[in-house]
Design a protein with these regions (language model features):
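Active-site flanking loop/helix segments enriched in acidic
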Residues: 34-70, 150-157
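Non-catalytic interface/linker regions that flank or bridge core catalytic/transmembrane domains
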Residues: 1-51, 55
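Divalent metal-dependent catalytic cores for phosphoryl transfer on phosphate-bearing substrates
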Residues: 64-219
Length: 219
């Protein structure tokens, strides 16, 4: 039986995560938020983004080699079968990975895909390929390598500097675009769906506030 999320050495996944850990830092996350905060790169329809994304290969995922558009339609269809009356959830399934359009703006794979994690505090051992994190420029910085780091207990996930990629980019697009009807619940599912160290690994609970416990149940 195939095991999902089985990460092996000497694979495209390991190479991508190594590059991610070498480059995703507190300063990088700040710079990416600043770089994309104006959302002035392009204007595209959902169908156009889905087509463009088929030119992108997600080398972080060991479980599927399907074109991105097929993955999007399959996800939406599976949700429709299980929740036929929940249109918001179906739309969320369709668009959840559209932030991968970042590759079209020249971003390398390591800044587009992969599990997300928090910069500016201790890096938990449940992170994929944890042993390669020692080469992260922030790893030995005493300001960033304590349990709380630069944050306060219970500050809320939205106060954390999470590694920047397709989830955060799409969340910011939705947050600044008032022409959609998705509620904050489904926007948060998009924002945190790759945050595996948190929702699956049990890390970062110390930072959660009351609303984050609701988000965790939703995810």
């Amino acid at each position: 039986m195939h095991k999902f999320r089985e990460y092996k050495i000497n694979t495209p996944q390991e190479r991508l995560y190594y590059n991610m850990y070498m480059n995703q830092t507190v300063d990088f996350v700040k710079s990416q938020h600043l770089k994309y905060s104006k959302l002035n790169n392009c204007t595209m329809k959902i169908s156009e983004v889905l087509n463009v994304m088929d030119n992108f290969v997600d080398s972080s995922d060991p479980d599927t080699s399907l074109p991105n558009s097929i993955h999007a339609y399959q996800t939406a269809e599976r949700i429709r079968k299980k929740y036929p009356n929940n249109k918001e959830y179906q739309i969320t399934g369709l668009i959840h990975d559209l932030g991968k359009v970042l590759f079209k703006f020249g971003e390398p794979n390591w800044s587009v895909v992969g599990d997300t994690f928090v910069l500016g505090c201790e890096l938990p051992k449940c992170i994929v390929y944890y042993d390669t994190l020692k080469d992260n420029p922030d790893f030995n910085n005493p300001k960033y390598n304590t349990k709380l780091g630069i944050y306060q207990k219970g500050c809320g996930l939205d106060k954390l500097k999470i590694s920047f990629g397709h989830d955060e980019y799409l969340y910011q697009v939705l947050k600044q675009n008032k022409n959609h009807l998705l509620s904050e619940k489904y926007m948060n599912i998009i924002r945190y769906h790759s945050f595996y160290p948190w929702h699956t690994g049990g890390a970062y609970r110390i930072f959660m506030d009351q609303k984050d416990h609701i988000i965790l149940k939703d995810i």
